Each structure stands twice: as C-alpha cells, then as structure tokens.
Amino acid sequence: RDNPHKKICLLCVDPTRKRTGGALLGDRIRMNSLADNNLFMRSIASRGSGSEISANLDRAIEVAKAVGFDLIFCETSGIGQGSDAITKIADHSLYIMTAEFGAHSQLEKIEMLDVADLIVLNKFEKRGSEDALRAIRKQVKRNRNLFHVADEELPVVATIASQFADPGVDFLWQKLADEIGFNASEPFGQVGVRKGVIPPERVHYLAEIA
C-alpha cells in the first residue's frame, strides 16, 4: 500500500528430498493466486545444490531484474546454524527465527546473527519470547561490538506475523524500507502485543487443567 506502483517478485526455495528427488513446493500451494498484478511469485526446488538456496537462484534474480522488478524477495528453504549462503547473492538479508532455539548458548553458533542486516523474532506471542528477545539482543551486541547501542536501536525486531496489521511487521517493513529506499508508513500500536479475545497466557488453559 505504501508503494502501489512498484513491482515485487517473490522467489521461494523449497528443499529437494534426496531419496525421491522431488520437492513439495509448499509456498506455491498456499499462494495459488495473487490479488495484485504487480506481484509475481515463483517456487524453486533446491535440487542438488546441497544448500538452503537453489543453484539457479542467482540466475532467477538476474531474470527478475531484467524484466523490471523493483524489489526481489528470496526465501531460503531453511538455514542451519553455520549457513549464510543467501548473503552472497542478496543485497540485504533477513534472518527469521522463533524462541525455540534451545539454550542461550546455541545463539553463539548462529552465523546469521553476525551477518544479517535484520534479525526477526517471529511468533512473539509464544511463551518465553520476551526472554528470547533479550538473549538475542545480548548476543547481537557481543557479536557486533554494539554494547553502546540501545536495545531498541539494534537490528532486531519482534513480530507476530499471523496477526492482521501487526505493529511488529509494520516496524520491520519500516526498517527494511529505509535500507532499500521504499516508502513506509509509521507503525501504529505496540510491538509484540497479541490482539484477541483470549489473553496469550490463557490460550492453553484448558489443556493445562485437563
């Protein structure tokens, strides 16, 4: 809505199974139609790349550039702790994670916390997410020697992507838009707050008392 005349391309990589050689293009299944003619989405199998990206992803990006797309998003098939292949072909990189990363010491092993332009903690409504956000911020400060930077100024954003008009997602877009020169409206509301009839801490109440 902030850039109605811009053309956006989504290139989504899905993993290929070694045993069968096939790939379930799940993003294509969920997005079988797009409501805007300025949006294009293509699923790509990783095939034999041995990586979280396809061996042909860089060529797909060049084709998208050649036909005039203004912004190209590339989604990996999932990333390991020591992987950062996407940073070699993308101008800007986002690392999206949840609070289920295990012990805080596991953060030491995640390469993308060193190199990603933006780090996103999604599903922030889940229990333990606030502790996870503090741990991620501490790790980013250590990795990048940013001890003098306030927590709110770090390239770490908390989101609830499943929530309509989530302020965290709007704040993430604002940060990304600043980097790539796009327009972005001001986020409205408090980041990380789940809207709904049932408070987050009571969502699993019936299961807990059963």
Feature names for model-found ranges:
Residues 76-121, 127-135:
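Conserved P-loop NTPase nucleotide-binding/switch module
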Residues 182-210:
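Extended helical scaffolds that flank P-loop GTPase cores
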Residues 45, 49-56, 78, 108, ...:
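Catalytic cores of large soluble enzymes that bind and process phosphate-bearing ligands
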Residues 1-87, 92-96:
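Nucleotide-state-sensitive switch-loop elements of NTP-binding domains
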Residues 4-7, 72, 105, 141-148:
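Active-site phosphate-binding and catalytic loops of NTP-dependent enzymes
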Residues 110-183:
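Canonical P-loop GTPase G-domain recognition
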Residues 17-19, 102-103, 165:
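Flexible, glycine-rich phosphate/dinucleotide-binding loops
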